[in-house]
């Protein structure tokens, strides 16, 4: 009897857990292997060539787990490495897509702030997407160096201090729409809404997950709250710190907060 489809997820740290949580909401028979490269996090301020090498190494490690496909559950990794690695690996390599398109389509002519790492902001992938949508003048790039690292350490009070002046400036500029271009930032939605209550937040997790499941021909029935997902997962964190394993468990459990 054929077993569950086995897929790999990778991220520089904790951000991709937000994608794993989304996958687990579906009543699907999947076996997910999650690899958090905490030893080398954060990726967001590194050189593109270094990120490519790191992501390549993680994908090789995931191949050793006999996965059938890999999702780079990290916008920075996707921007820096996805195009190259798709040519190098025999299994499908999927990546993240910032939810710029739905934000633009639902708010024609309105300013859209894009919170992302410096690498994601500068890479050609994002520039091509903005050009395709004719959105160069509407997208306000907001680089957030160091913010993902605060999530990896569970320092949410520090993350709020970091975000307050950014959100204040966006309010003053009458920005009403915010795209989260980093999977780490999904875990900061509650902080963003606390400091900017009326902002509309967009992220690419849902669209990416649906694309992944469609491409792999996996059924997409969302589980009821009382039901249990058919998926199982394995966490691999290349960290010796107990904090990281404890935080990963908390991030996967606190559904209402995050």
UniProtKB/Swiss-Prot annotation:
It holds the Pfam family Asp_Glu_race. The active site is at residues 74, 182. One of its GO terms (biological process) is cell wall organization. Substrate binds at residues 11-12, 43-44, 75-76, 183-184. GO terms for molecular function: glutamate racemase activity. It catalyses: L-glutamate = D-glutamate. Gene3D superfamilies: 3.40.50.1860. Its EC number is 5.1.1.3. Pathway: Cell wall biogenesis; peptidoglycan biosynthesis. InterPro entries: Asp/Glu/hydantoin_racemase, Asp/Glu_race, Glu_race. Keywords: Cell shape, Cell wall biogenesis/degradation, Isomerase, Peptidoglycan synthesis. SUPFAM superfamilies: Aspartate/glutamate racemase. Belongs to the aspartate/glutamate racemases family. HAMAP family: Glu_racemase. Provides the (R)-glutamate required for cell wall biosynthesis. This is Glutamate racemase.
């Amino acid at each position: 009897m054929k077993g569950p489809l086995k897929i790999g997820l990778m991220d520089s740290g904790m951000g991709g857990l937000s994608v794993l949580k989304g996958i687990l909401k579906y009543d699907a028979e999947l076996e997910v292997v999650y690899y958090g490269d905490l030893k080398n996090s954060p990726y967001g301020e590194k050189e593109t060539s270094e990120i490519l090498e790191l992501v390549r190494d993680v994908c090789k490690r995931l191949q050793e787990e006999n996965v059938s496909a890999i999702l780079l559950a990290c916008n920075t990794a996707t921007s820096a490495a996805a195009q190259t690695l798709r040519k190098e690996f025999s299994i499908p390599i999927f990546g993240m897509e910032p939810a710029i398109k739905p934000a633009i389509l639902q708010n024609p002519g309105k300013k859209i702030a894009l919170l992302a790492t410096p690498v994601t902001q500068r890479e050609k992938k994002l520039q091509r997407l903005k050009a395709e949508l004719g959105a160069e003048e509407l997208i306000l790039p907001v680089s957030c160096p160091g913010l993902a690292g605060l999530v990896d350490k569970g320092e949410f009070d520090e993350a709020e201090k970091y975000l307050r002046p950014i959100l204040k400036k966006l309010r003053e500029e009458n920005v009403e729409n915010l795209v989260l271009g980093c999977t780490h930032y999904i875990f900061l939605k509650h902080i963003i809404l606390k400091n900017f209550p009326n902002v509309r937040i967009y992220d690419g997790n849902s669209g990416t997950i649906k694309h992944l499941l469609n491409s792999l021909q996996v059924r997409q029935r969302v589980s009821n709250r009382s039901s249990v997902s058919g998926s199982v997962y394995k966490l691999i964190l290349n960290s010796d710190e107990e904090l990281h394993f404890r935080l990963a468990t908390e991030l996967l459990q606190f559904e209402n907060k995050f």
